[in-house]
A protein has these predicted regions:
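Accessory RNA-recognition modules of RNA-modification enzymes
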Residues: 1-156
Length: 156
């Protein structure tokens, strides 16, 4: 009824056929792309999530129900890599640090996984170790990309 009301009242359309709404077959885990800024929590641990409105503060997201579960595995492996290598994480306020964003795609039909890291500079220290960890933990991994963004912005 809300849709009908919006179309007639807001849209000004009076004469149309209104059919029943068909619900989504898969209300969760239907997205095939995700991107997360990477930062540090107050305790120093790596945090992946979303920016709080109009801030550089990252709200942690351990499991977004819109995204494939495989993305959680990528995040966990990346956290282990950061802990193991003490990887330098980018700080939005100072513009210093290396590892900025994690971007992922999953092929719905092929189940192939693409992982992209956005870094401040050229490459990533010990990136061979990161690739090894990803390959060991993700049998459907198809590609790993290191993308350089040196601009002082949180735009990927």
């Amino acid at each position: 009824m809300r849709v009908y009301d919006a179309v007639t009242r807001i849209g000004g359309i009076k004469d149309f056929e209104f059919k029943d709404i068909i619900s989504c077959e898969r209300p969760d885990r239907y997205r095939n792309k995700a991107q997360f800024p990477i930062g540090r929590a107050k305790d120093g641990s790596a945090v992946f999530g979303f920016y709080s409105f109009h801030t550089h503060r990252i709200i942690p997201c351990d499991d977004c129900l819109l995204q494939p579960e495989a993305f959680n595995s990528v995040i966990e492996i990346t956290k282990r890599f950061i802990d193991k290598t003490n990887a330098d994480i980018y700080d939005e306020t100072t513009g210093k640090g290396r590892l900025r964003h994690l971007y992922m795609r999953l092929g719905e039909i092929t189940d192939e996984l693409m992982v992209c890291y956005v870094v401040n500079g050229n490459g990533l220290k010990q990136e061979d170790e990161l690739v090894r960890m990803l390959k060991d933990g993700l049998p459907n991994l198809k590609s790993v990309i290191i993308n350089s963004n040196r601009e002082k912005t949180n735009v990927v």
